[in-house]
Swiss-Prot record:
Forms part of the ribosomal stalk which helps the ribosome interact with GTP-bound translation factors. Is thus essential for accurate translation. The keyword Ribonucleoprotein applies. The lineage of its organism: Bacteria, Bacillati, Mycoplasmatota, Mycoplasmoidales, Metamycoplasmataceae. SUPFAM superfamilies: ClpS-like, Ribosomal protein L7/12, oligomerisation (N-terminal) domain. It comes from Mycoplasmopsis agalactiae (strain NCTC 10123 / CIP 59.7 / PG2) (Mycoplasma agalactiae). This is Large ribosomal subunit protein bL12. Pfam families: Ribosomal_L12, Ribosomal_L12_N. Signal peptide: none annotated. InterPro entries: Ribosomal_bL12, Ribosomal_bL12_C, Ribosomal_bL12_C/ClpS-like, Ribosomal_bL12_oligo, Ribosomal_bL12_oligo_N_sf. The keyword Ribosomal protein applies. GO terms for biological process: translation. GO terms for cellular component: cytosolic large ribosomal subunit. One of its GO terms (molecular function) is structural constituent of ribosome.
Length: 123
């Protein structure tokens, strides 16, 4: 028996009616033991994984916009740091303030830093 090429298979499919294609699909499901619900679950898994990744964010301080003192105070208060540590962190921009925190917490942290005058990015 000659090997069926991809091109000849596609060409044959083009000549079939919709009903014939549906019958072919059903026959393939039976022949290879394909469970359509398992395929749907497997296809949905990457989407759920991507959604999970979006639920945790990192807060990155991009710039102080000339309002370093206010931002140092905000960082000190929000992260419970000593004044010197907060100053070092703000002096070395861009700086990751917190990683892999819940999205709601990241948004709240960003709002307080923006209020102090900072440019903040959530990743």
């Amino acid at each position: 028996m000659a090997k069926l090429t991809k091109e000849s298979f596609i060409s044959s499919l083009k000549e079939m009616s919709i009903k014939e294609v549906m019958e072919l699909v059903e026959a393939m499901k039976e022949e290879f033991g394909i469970d359509p619900s398992a395929v749907a679950v497997a296809a949905a898994a990457p989407a759920a994984e991507a959604e999970e990744k979006k639920s945790t964010l990192s807060v990155i301080l991009k710039s102080d916009n000339g309002k370093k003192l206010a931002i140092v105070k905000a960082v000190k208060e929000l992260l419970n740091l000593a004044l010197m540590d907060a100053n070092k962190l703000v002096s070395t921009l861009p700086a990751t303030l917190k990683e892999n925190i819940p999205a709601a917490e990241a948004e709240a942290l960003k709002a307080k830093l923006v209020e102090a005058g900072a440019d903040v990015e959530l990743k």
